[in-house]
Amino acid sequence: MSTPTPLSYKDAGVDIDAGNALVSNIKAAVKRTRRPEVMGNLGGFGALCEIPTKYKQPVLVSGTDGVGTKLRLAIDYKKHDTVGIDLVAMCVNDLIVQGAEPLFFLDYYATGKLDVETATSVVNGIGEGCFQSGCALIGGETAEMPGMYEGEDYDLAGFCVGVVEKADIIDGSKVAAGDALIALASSGPHSNGYSLVRKVLEVSQADPQQDLNGKPLIEHLLEPTKIYVKSLLKLIAASDVHAMAHITGGGFWENIPRVLPDNLKAVIQGDSWQWPAVFSWLMENGNIAEYEMYRTFNCGVGMLVALPADKVDAALALLAAEGEQAWLIGAIADREGNEEQVEIL
């Protein structure tokens, strides 16, 4: 009887050396995001972070999210350096809605076979997103799971914790009839609606490399999600923000009501902005109804802010100084009976 060949973890499809190489590659990206509250170094069993001393009654705010099927496009077109920004953006933009300053972020990267170069590119993007939002990348998990994912396909998840002064939590309770609505421009579809995007590409048989407003369509589709944290923290400090809505999955119809009292509605002027070309392209090539567009995509509005009408001019000036494209998009009004909470005129 012959002696069986000794087996290793690598024979089973898990390369520990590749994982160690990845950790080495991303140290610079992690270091760049470090905040003074972070204790210890990368690689511990748990990551430690103090609460900033400026907070008197700190409340922690947490969120978790992914990038969805935008990853499929990124993998197919080998564009891995910006999906990490998407991942961070989807989490930190949810936190800022409640007035929270992001403190730290952790990521989960799962794949069938770890490609160190690809994973390094992805995590460097996560580091860039954390840098843009002033958030520390303090840990994460890389899971190589042969048999669970096809080849080098991968999936991402992110988890973020922020902090807000208890008295300064923004929860929509101050929203009142007559409040103005300011829109902040998106950079594209962000990270929502990509199953429909991919279906439009399939049905229309469109060439993703075709020109759209001076650059390939695929670049419009893979444009990273805009991070609004730093500009909105400044707006919150300088103005009287009553509510904010991050326009993600569910579009206008689902996200805006989340921050409105039941007796109020948002009345939006549909002609107050022009949709970016990528949304018009999707609508035309997918024969998508306008209602469905507003239900699925942000249609050029990544964030909505409600504040007193007399604060609009100062808010728009501040946002412009921070590099944001913003405009007055509508107002809050009383809602009667079973009226919809969002009207687009």
Curated annotation (Swiss-Prot):
The protein's annotated catalytic reaction(s) are: 2-formamido-N(1)-(5-O-phospho-beta-D-ribosyl)acetamidine + ATP = 5-amino-1-(5-phospho-beta-D-ribosyl)imidazole + ADP + phosphate + H(+)
Pfam families hit by this protein: AIRS (PF00586), AIRS_C (PF02769)
Instruction: List, in alphabetical order, the Gene Ontology terms for molecular function in this entry.
Output: ATP binding; phosphoribosylamine-glycine ligase activity; phosphoribosylformylglycinamidine cyclo-ligase activity
Give the Enzyme Commission number: 6.3.3.1
Q: Quote a single Gene Ontology cellular component term.
A: cytosol
Q: Where in the cell is it found?
A: Cytoplasm
Question: Which domain of life does this protein belong to?
Answer: Bacteria
Q: In which pathway does it act?
A: Purine metabolism; IMP biosynthesis via de novo pathway; 5-amino-1-(5-phospho-D-ribosyl)imidazole from N(2)-formyl-N(1)-(5-phospho-D-ribosyl)glycinamide: step 2/2
InterPro entries tied to this protein: PurM-like_C_dom, PurM-like_C_sf, PurM-like_N, PurM-like_N_sf, PurM_cligase
Keywords tagged on the record? ATP-binding, Cytoplasm, Ligase, Nucleotide-binding, Purine biosynthesis
Read off the SUPFAM superfamilies from this record: PurM C-terminal domain-like, PurM N-terminal domain-like
* One GO term (biological process): adenine biosynthetic process
Specify the enzyme's EC class, one word: ligase
Q: What family does this belong to?
A: Belongs to the AIR synthase family.
The record's section on PANTHER family has: TRIFUNCTIONAL PURINE BIOSYNTHETIC PROTEIN ADENOSINE-3, TRIFUNCTIONAL PURINE BIOSYNTHETIC PROTEIN ADENOSINE-3-RELATED
**Protein name, as recorded:** Phosphoribosylformylglycinamidine cyclo-ligase
Q: Which organism is it from?
A: Shewanella baltica (strain OS155 / ATCC BAA-1091)
State the taxonomy lineage.
Bacteria, Pseudomonadati, Pseudomonadota, Gammaproteobacteria, Alteromonadales
Gene that produces this protein: purM
